[in-house]
Amino acid sequence: MTEIKVPDLEQKALALLQADADKIYKLIDVQMENLTMPQCPLYEEVLDTQMFGLSREVEYAVRLGLISDDIGREIMGSLERKLAHLHELFNQR
């Protein structure tokens, strides 16, 4: 049986969380392109659901010791900043 080293798991967890954050950004970007107003209930529900799911993933990885709390906050904060910027761009149209 192959033993998995902890740093490998840490890197994999970080990569998976970042990939999920990128998927959320792309999903919201596509929704924004197809909406006439960002206050659409469907848009808000999708955003809230996706962000909640990612926050649970991050918390789980932190609790397992795969990532630090600071890295988890950075993943969430970075995505929130990107989405806020996307929202600003949409409102400038």
UniProtKB/Swiss-Prot annotation:
A Pfam cross-reference name: DUF1507
InterPro entries: UPF0358, UPF0358_sf
Paired cysteines (S-S): none
Family assignment from sequence similarity: Belongs to the UPF0358 family.
Matching HAMAP family: UPF0358
NCBIfam families for this protein: PRK13666.1
Name of the protein described by the UniProt record: UPF0358 protein BBR47_22520
